[in-house]
A protein has these predicted regions:
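Short hydrophobic core segments
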Residues: 6, 80, 103-113, 156, ...
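Glycine-rich dinucleotide-binding loop and its adjacent helix/turn
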Residues: 110-172, 207, 267-269, 491-495, ...
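Mid-to-C-terminal Rossmann-like scaffold of FAD/NAD(P)H-dependent oxidoreductases
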Residues: 1, 8, 284-397, 428-432, ...
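Beta1-alpha1 glycine-rich phosphate/pyrophosphate-binding loop at the start
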Residues: 1-74, 79, 117, 166-189, ...
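Rhodanese-like catalytic fold shared by cysteine-dependent sulfurtransferases
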Residues: 417-469, 477-510, 516-569
Length: 569
């Protein structure tokens, strides 16, 4: 059996290695148009910023290494330019001299990946305007930084690459402006979770502009000007375009393969395309979203590796199927970590999925042990069954392991009640007896059981100001002096004084309660409801509201963590 693989990196290289483990006699050829067959493309920004200092560390496997260990024929600098499925042949161009040759296959696997989106703007071809996708791109950017006095950089786009490059340019001592066309960075998060990232970025010295529509690039002195619609200009010595990626499917399109979402290659559960004996994996294919079942384009290394393994299994006659992706992702941004899995609100609404949500605020480990840091956890769930649909976390230590637990929970179809029962590793330096994952389950359980009604940050401004409802703040006097009230018409009664001051409240008016994070206001709601008051708890508390409704700065201090008692001041 002769298997030709077009493209290496995650999906193609994984498939090749799996094929060899399953079939020692197969002839396996990898065609890779770059000079690197298997490299850590997720690590490229960190070489630019100097975090990774040895570029050889980015190379996971060399052509020689593949040949020696796996007996695989790796042909770098060679590009597949034409695919003829009916003839089982592919035309290959040697990039060094432009010569071509035909290559026959029994099975073909496409792993062309994705290409950076270029918006085709005036001045975009200036050599100081870069994209980042390959090792060669990385070396060009690093060389430019080394050889030129780069003082100011503009990053266009606030996705994963844009944010990671902004961080690493700051690490390299470059004043960095990030221009994002939309109203938020990091689209896998909902806007209310991204708000904390906006505050944090600005606190790290990144000049962040949202709603910034770039119209072109033009020379300005010794550098460039990045021009916005409306005429505003940002000076730059270097520009990085990080506005997303698109499936690199031109070869597949010309060959007549069926394409789907965003032009990605349509495949079945065994990663087979519409052409006989042709498979496809990685960032170029559409997949089934595990929660909704809908076709999606999810360009991540984890799914690409799994798909490569499954395609290899099927080529070798093994029963294996890809059942879908959750889109689980994590981002390091200076000291901050942001992660998500499953559905966010935008996706749930688009798919017509019924959902409810809770926002909880927990410590990374036992708050009495030094170094505890906060994390904000937003969890979406099915209001009828309690099944977990999606989660987002923004915080510091321990975000990744909680997200992994929640991703596994969604995959297993767990409900909120089952989250409360998870027996997770605990010792004071590592976690809490009530882990942040357990806490999310407890809060959902309370909401579904009718123990508390909740409202969200965007409802605060819409609450009547005519005295027909009561806004009750149960924080300490010191907190209120420092942070202020949600609204000037709010009533302040500290939680520990509430039982003795119930007479100040009107049972004929609904009470909307808040504290700093949502825990003490929940306790207040339990007191009030059992004394005949109708009340609602502000999910996420003052802290979550303030990131979304004000221009507050980021506060990473472990203030009023869940479960920590507070005094009067």
């Amino acid at each position: 059996m002769k298997v030709v693989i077009i493209g290496g990196v995650a999906g193609g290289a994984t498939a090749a290695a799996r094929l060899r483990r399953l079939d020692e006699r197969a002839e396996i050829i990898i065609l890779e148009r770059t000079g690197y067959v298997s490299y850590a493309n997720c690590g490229l920004p960190y070489y630019v910023g100097g975090v990774i200092t040895d570029r050889e560390e980015l190379t996971l496997q060399t052509p020689e290494g593949f040949r020696n260990r796996f007996g695989i024929d790796v042909r770098v600098g060679q590009e597949a330019v034409e695919l003829r499925p009916e003839q089982h042949t592919v035309t290959v161009r040697r990039l060094e001299d432009g010569s071509t040759y035909a290559l026959h296959y029994d099975k073909l696997l496409l792993s062309p990946g994705a290409r950076p989106v270029r918006p085709n703007l005036p001045g975009e071809d200036d050599p100081r305007v870069f994209t980042l996708r390959t090792v060669e791109d990385t070396l060009r950017i690093r060389a430019y930084l080394d050889e030129h006095p780069v003082r100011r950089a503009v990053v266009v786009g606030g996705g994963f690459i844009g944010l990671e490059m902004a961080e690493n340019l700051v690490h390299a001592g470059v004043h960095t402006t990030l221009l994002q066309r939309g109203a938020q960075v990091l689209p896998p998060l909902d806007a209310d979770m991204a708000a904390e990232i906006h505050a944090y970025l600005r606190g790290q010295g990144v000049e962040l502009r949202l709603g910034a529509r770039v119209s072109g690039f033009s020379p300005q002195g010794d550098g460039l000007a990045v021009e916005l619609e409306g005429g505003e200009r940002f000076p730059a010595d270097l520009v990085l375009l990080g506005i997303g990626v698109a499936p690199d499917t031109e070869l597949a399109r010309r060959a007549g393969l069926a394409l789907g979402v965003k032009g990605a290659i349509s495949v079945d559960g065994q990663m087979r395309t519409s052409a006989p004996d042709v498979y496809a994996v990685g960032d170029a294919v559409e997949v089934r979203h595990f929660v909704t079942g809908a076709k999606s384009h999810i360009a991540l290394a984890g799914p690409a590796n799994k798909q490569g393994r499954i395609a290899a299994d099927h080529i070798c006659g093994r029963r294996s199927a890809y059942t879908g992706a959750l889109g689980t992702s994590v981002l390091k941004l200076f000291d901050l970590t942001a992660a998500s899995t499953g559905l966010n609100e935008k996706q749930a609404r688009a798919a017509g999925v019924a959902y409810d949500k809770v926002v909880t605020y927990s410590a990374s480990h036992a708050s009495y042990y030094p170094g505890a840091r906060n994390m904000t956890v937003k969890t979406l769930f099915d209001p009828a069954s309690g099944r977990i649909l999606g989660a987002q976390i923004v915080g510091f230590d321990g975000v990744d392991k909680r997200m992994d637990v929640l991703a596994a929970a969604i995959r297993a179809g767990l409900t909120a009640e089952q989250l409360t029962e998870l027996d997770l590793a605990y010792a004071p330096p590592y976690g809490s007896a009530k882990d942040p994952v357990n806490m999310a389950g407890y809060v959902i359980e309370n909401v579904r059981a009718g123990l508390v009604e909740q409202h969200h940050w965007d409802a605060v401004a819409e609450l009547p100001a005519d005295g027909s409802v009561i806004l009750l703040d149960v924080r300490t006097p010191g907190e209120v002096r420092k942070q202020g009230l949600l609204r000037s018409d709010a009533l302040h009664i500290p939680l520990d004084e509430l039982r003795g001051r119930l007479g100040e409240l009107d049972k004929g008016k609904k009470i909307y309660v808040n504290c700093y994070s949502g825990l003490r206001s929940y306790l207040a709601c339990r007191i009030l409801s059992q004394h005949g008051f109708q009340c609602s708890n502000l999910s996420g508390g003052w802290r979550f509201w303030s990131y979304n409704a004000t221009d507050r700065t980021h506060d990473a201090a472990p203030t009023h963590l869940c479960g920590v008692p507070t005094g009067k001041d």
